Structures are given as structure tokens and as C-alpha cells.
Amino acid sequence: MPTAQKKTPQKKNREAVEQAEKNEGKAVAGKGAAKTAAAKRPAAKKSAVKKTAAKTSVVKKSAAETSAAKESAAKTSAEEKTAGKKTAVKKPAAKKSATKKPAAKKTAVKKTAAKTAKKEAPKTLVVVESPAKAKTIEKYLGKKYMVRASMGHLRDLPKSQFGIDVENDFAPKYINIRGKGDLIKALKKDAKHASKVYLASDPDREGEAIAWHLAHILGINPDENCRIVFNEITKPAIQAAVKEPYPINIDRVDAQQARRMLDRIVGYKLSPLLWRKIKKGLSAGRVQSVTVKLICDREKEIQAFVPEEYWTVGMKLKKERGVQFAAELATVDGKKLALHSKEETSALVKDMAKQSFSVKEVKKRERRRNPVAPFTTSSMQQDASRKLGFTSRRTMMIAQQLYEGVELGRRGPVGLITYMRTDSTRLSDLALDEVRGYVEASFGADYLPEKPNIYAAGKKAQDAHEAIRPTSVENAPELVEKYLTREQLRLYTLIWQRFVASQMTPAVFDTVSVSVAAGERYIARASGSTLKFPGFLAVYADNKKEKDVLLPELLAGEALSLVRLLPEQHFTEPPPRYNEASLVKTLEEKDIGRPSTYAPIIETILARGYVVRQDKHFQPTDLGFLVDDMLEEYFKDIVDVQFTAELENELDEIAEGKVDKNDLLRSFYEPFEETLEKADEAIGEVEIPEEVSDVVCEKCGRNMVVKQGRYGKFLACPGFPDCRNTKPILKDTGVPCPKCGGRIVERRSRRGQAFYGCENYPACDYVTWDQPLTEKCPECGAFMMRHRYKNGRVLPYCSNEACKTRIDHPINKEIEKSRARLEAKKAKEAAAAEKAAEAEAGK
């Protein structure tokens, strides 16, 4: 809006001219030769003033134009001043050029005013969560929009107090997050001058809550059409979103607030109890405590497990012409084989060796393996853990980068994948049409199913978003490879391949199952399969590794010769510890939390010292067991899997408008508060048992104790805080130090990475990342070392620098085979991309 001016533009211009005239008068005083020029100057100035006044009347409509005219007038007066000085000492003819300058300025003022007016025109403000996303979206929306980032949440419950008024229907007390003050001021300023404001936070409950908080801060009515969402950051999706704004969904906001307040109730009320009874710095949480319980329960199963002995009996058989194949004993006297001792097995083997062998039955069939669904958040985290070795946190961080936009050269920032927090396997019609066209063009009609593959939604799928997929299948990994980091490329390739494979035909195998009779009592079985048609496996190799197992052509009734029997002893194994993938899968199956929360939950329980990672598996610490046992005894509901799952269901119902938020909070809070009071009285102060070592602290003489850190156990002085001495727990490798003859021990870096050094450090500074081996070099007798490359290759080599002995490790052959397959696959993909490009060019 134009603002009122105390002085009109004409008046200001006139004052500027008069000031210039005064200056000129001073410059020519005492010089008679210039008096005539000085006397004529006011007449010239009047015409300049008239012209300037005429110009400024055109720009009277806006404050921006007025300021442009002011600037122009000031420049004009300055030029006239200079011109006047020059004419005062030169010829009067110079005055003509001086009087022409305002006329030349006329068009300049018009252009400047028009340009300024264009710049200052009100724009539509779009608020997103991150700067990377803002940059990408601004490119798609154009100059009529300004896109700003809120940097996530701007308001939250206070850290210094409970922040929930229980007596007033659980009213939350929200405050602006510390450090966000300047950002809030800037957003308010932008919103004030904007023609419209659209809140474009993420399309989930958390994003809906952020939009609701933004509406409060910016003074926007949440019932207005101020909310826009998009599942992918592409030009069509963004432009479609701004055409269809809608009011903020209060039910989804309530669901997020209920979750936040439940977590605050448990964390704020229960954590101080752990501080008082066990030690400071601990925490409890509605989801984290259940996660710790799962890990502790699994460890208890492992500890209680008693291995049982059992035996299998394999055999080598051959046809008359000498073609051998393997089989395994399956049944004895019509019952499943069950051998539990060497004596029992030896007797059976002795009896079998006397029997005649023949083919009893041959079954041939075609087996199909269907492709898997495109990624959800959970399945992406699991696959990235299994195939790429990524933690859930790292997976989500990289996926966020791919979603928000990556610079693709001249194309600028491009969002490469759809929204990465989803539990849906649904694909849009547009995406299905695009990928089906790509499959047919790149692989042929045999790889394209007659109809799109539709996958059943999970029982908890909200189906608000699509599955995780590339925003365009044409952005094949090899085409964007040079713009991505190594980690971005690996995850993007996984997402792209899974999406394309999900819309391809099944893989087809020819399978053969053979039953072999050994006398009347024994039946052995052999099976083989060959890949007949790769189907989706041409793009995406899933976790089921099937090797071609070939059997000779066999006929029912055909006689066979026994080459040898192969009895083998086994022992049953305990259930494995959870790794990242299996833990995420279990949490999802049991409806504990939501996939988007798994990464921060895992990081929290590691940071608190409740669990540690050992060889990529989670192992509970003594502290984890202690806290879990206490919560199990006094707060059964908090660590009960079923109770936590039911709470999740009720949160879903709040989002659907079926359950009132305050009813849920009240039903949880009242019994929890009562249990908390009883537990506080009943639980005495708990002492964490410490494992005392035989290592003496050299600073104070006490026996050091074993402590659990984030990256494993270490020794610490029990005299803390008076004595702060700590030491790593050293693992002897059994290899002598080549420098001083001491022992080489395994140590841990601050990040938990293993390295090797002399036990006499710092007197001896021998150190290496490579693992010393007890094996001796076959050439010189020195101990061997093992170097492991990033690509997985292993190189055993001699520690004697003068000896050049290198030994190839068996694993390297497998790596080479895998690499060859990968190269062949890449070549095939490149050829397919080239073919698709040629087809596109032909169109």
C-alpha cells in the first residue's frame, strides 16, 4: 500500500534545485565574467523543475515509485550542480547540454519506476520445512511466489517444565523454540507483505502439526484454504498443489499432539524416577522402553538356550553312466528323520549301506516367483540395512536429500524420489503408465504383465501417500550418477530398481524333485532348479539367493548306485540377536511406533547406553537389563507390546476423527500417575553392579572397574570424580610386536573402530589398522596380516616388508563373481537406456 508523504515529490525536487542554485551562486561569487551565466541559470532551472514535476506526477501511485523519483531528482540536482560549475568557468554554450539532461532522465525514471513496481508487487508466500526443498520448489513456481523454510518445528512443549495443564483438558503450553526468534520475525514480515500464504510442510501428521503451529504464529485462520501438500517435488505436483489448497486437518493435528503429550507424560514423569533410583541421564519412553524390552527378552532367550545335538545323513548317488548327484535322507519308516546321537546315526548308516537304491518318483513343475512391492518406509530401511549396510538413521537422512532435491547440472535442483515417510504400496496411475512404458521399451513385451501389479496394503497402512518411488523412471541411476554422492546413488539405485521390478513379470524356474528309495525303510530326496525366465530378477535381485542346481535326467524305477553316505553332526542354534533390519521388521509387525520414528528410537537407546552394537547386532548392557527389569516390575503397561500397539491404534482413530484426544490422554494419565506414586515409594535406590578387574589404576592404586560405553566396554577408576583415569580393554591377538617384542593388542578408536597396537604404548608406537594373524608366512616365517578393502576384498600379506608374499583369500573369488554380474547388469541397463533414448528420439 502507498504510504503518506510529509513532502510531495514536486516540493522535494524544487528544494533540491534551489539548493543547487545556492551552491552555484557561491561558486561564481566574485567572478564578473560568469555573472551573466549565473543570472540566466534560474530560467533554465524552472523548465527542469517543470519537467521533473511532470515526471513525478506519473509515479504518484505507489511508495516504491515515489522513492524512485526522489532518487532521480537527487541525481538531477547533483548533475546540474556540476554542470553549473563547469559553465561558470567555461563558455555559456555549455549550458545547452546542462538543460537537456532532465529530458534524458525522463525515460530513465519511467523504466526504474516500472521495474521497482514489478519487484515490489505482492507475492504468494509458500512455507516449507527445509531450505533444500524451498530452493527446488521456488524454481517450479516462478517469480510470483516466494518460498521460505521453517526449519522444522517452530513451537514445542517447554523443556524446563511439564507443559501440559492436566486440569484444563490437557491443554498444552507451547513456546517458541529457542534460537528460532529471528526466523519467526522474518516469516511474519514475509507473510505480512504476501498476497496469500500457503503452508506446505510434509504430508504427514507431523507436517500437519507444523502447519497448524505456523498458522498460529503467522495469524492465519486454520479453517481457511491455507494448506497444500504434494507427494513428490516435481513441477506438475507442485503446480497442482497450489491450485487445490484446503483447511488444516485438525484431526491429524490432534493425533500428533496426543502422541507428543503421551511421550511427554511418560518421559517427563518416569525419567526423573530413573534418575533418582538408578543414575542421572537415563530416560524412559513409550516406544523406546518397549524396544529395549524386545532386545533384552531376545538376549534372555539366547542365554537360556540349551543346544541340542542332531544328525543329518547326506549321500552321493550316481546313474549307470557315472553322472553323480546329491540327496539327503528325509524319512525312516515313513517318519521324519530324527537322529540325536553318533551311535544312533552310525547304526542307521551301516544299515543303509546294505540297501539297494532306486528312483521312486520324479516331479517336474514350473515355479514362479513374484516381484516384491515398491518400498514403504519400513521395507526401505530393512533392505538398505541388509544390502547397503545403512543404519535406519542414515537411510532416512539420504532419502530426505533425494526427496528435497539434488542439483542435476543445468536442470538445477530436482526431487528424485517421492515422500519417504509412508506405509503405502500404492502407485499413482501416472506413475504406473510411465513405468509400464519404460519396461516395455527397455526389456520387451515379455517382461510386462498384462495389467499393472497391485499390492495389498498392510493392515496399518494409512494410504495417504504413494509408495516410495522415483519421481520419473527416466532418471535412471546411470544417468544421474555423476551428480550424486556414493551413498545417494546406492540408495537411489535400490529405490529405482525396486520400483521398476514391481511392475514386471514373475521370474520362472524349472524345478525337479526326486524321491530315492533305499530298501523298504528309507526315503531320500534331491531337488534342483534352473532359471527359465528372469522376469523382474533382470532388474532387482531380492534377498532369496537361488543357485541353479542341476540334476541328471532321471526316470521312476531307474536303479542308482551309492557312492558314499555322509553323516554330519549339528547342534540347534539360539535365536539370533536383532540387527537393524530384523528389529525394524519386528517393530512394524507388532505395531510399535511408526516407521518414521524407528531411526530416532534406535539412536536414543544406543545413546542412553541401554544397548550396544556388536557386529551389527544389538546387545543389551547391564544397565539396559536393570532398567528393563524395573519397568517390567512396576510399569508393566509401559513395556507391554500389546498395550503399546493398542495405543497406536487409538492414535490412528484420533486422526480419523473417531476418538477424542482428551479421552485417550485421560484414560492413560490417571492410572499411570497412580502407578508412578506407588513405584516411587516402593523402589529403593538401585546400585548398578560393577565388574571389578584386576587392573590397578596407576594414578590412585584402586582396582579399575568395567564400564559400558557407546562403543563397547572400557576400564574406569572407581574413584571418579577424584580420579578420572580410564583405559581401553585390550584384546590380545597372540602376535608379537615387530618393533619391541611385546604383544599386539586390539584397541578401539573413539568411534568404536578396531585397530591394533603394541601393549607397551606409549613406549612403543607400533600401530596398524590391518589385523595381525597367528598364521606364519610360508616364505619367511613372519606373521601374516589381513587387509580388508572397502569393496569387501581381503588380502592376507606378510608383515615382513622385505617379503612380498601375498595370498589370495577365497572370499575374493565370490566378490569377483559378484562384481562381474554387477558389471554385466550395468551394461545391460546402459544398453536398455540407450535403446529407450533412441526410441524417444524416433518418436
Model-flagged regions — what are they?
Residues 233-315, 365:
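C-terminal or mid-to-C-terminal helical accessory/interaction module adjacent to the motor/catalytic core
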Residues 2-25, 29-31, 35, 40-41, ...:
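Basic, low-complexity terminal or inter-domain segments flanking catalytic cores
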Residues 359-362, 370-384, 411-420, 574-586, ...:
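Short acidic, hydrophobic short linear motifs in intrinsically disordered regions
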Residues 2, 109-260, 269, 330, ...:
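Intrinsically disordered, low-complexity regulatory segments
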Residues 136-140, 186, 209-217, 237-241, ...:
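Alpha-helical scaffold elements adjacent to nucleotide-binding pockets in ATP/GTP-utilizing enzyme cores
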Residues 338-373:
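Metal- or metallocofactor-binding catalytic centers and their adjacent structured scaffolds
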Residues 259-269, 287, 315-319, 367-379, ...:
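Core structural elements
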Residues 122, 202-203, 279-283, 364-373, ...:
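Conserved short loop/turn motifs at secondary-structure junctions
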